[in-house]
Amino acid sequence: MAFFDTGYFKGNKPRSLLAKKRNIKNKITAWGLGKQYYDGNRLDGYGGYKYDGRWKKFLPKIIKKYKLSGKSKVLDLGCKKGFFLKDLRDLIPGIKIHGIENHYYPIQHAHKNVKKYLSFSNYYNLKFKNKHFDLVFAFNSIYSQNL
């Protein structure tokens, strides 16, 4: 598949500045991908990972590119708290969504409008038939896997 740039935003400060402030304790805390990573100090991870509707700005390009409609089925692999899927459902009523996350904390603290569509699993041997989904979205998840 060819590269597709959604225009996803870039921060106003270089990430390297934050990386220089992180110490080994921050990195070990982040590695756990739990409460401190998602909702703790910014040096430990996301630092207050709360819903802000940011995907609504980028989703129209994705919707158009992949011709998504209310009849489409979308899997978000590495869905975190489900914010991508929440915004997708807001923009396309009726769309079938499912999120897979390999850490419990973000699912337990997922957005209430999509929580029931999220499940815990590793990213291998998923129990879906081939071509079940019209789009599999894997933002910030594949890089962490041993492929």
Regions picked out by a protein language model, each given a short descriptive name:
Residues 1-28:
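N-terminal auxiliary segments of SAM/dcSAM-dependent transferases
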Residues 40-54:
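Class I SAM-dependent methyltransferase Rossmann-like catalytic core
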Residues 52-69:
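Conserved alpha-helix/loop element of class I SAM-dependent methyltransferases that forms part
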Residues 71-80:
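Conserved class I S-adenosyl-L-methionine
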Residues 83-125:
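Class I SAM-dependent methyltransferase SAM/SAH-binding core
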Residues 137:
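A conserved beta-strand element that flanks and buttresses the S-adenosyl-L-methionine
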Residues 140-141:
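Short catalytic micro-motifs in class I SAM-dependent methyltransferases
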Residues 145-147:
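A short, conserved alpha-helix within the catalytic core of class I
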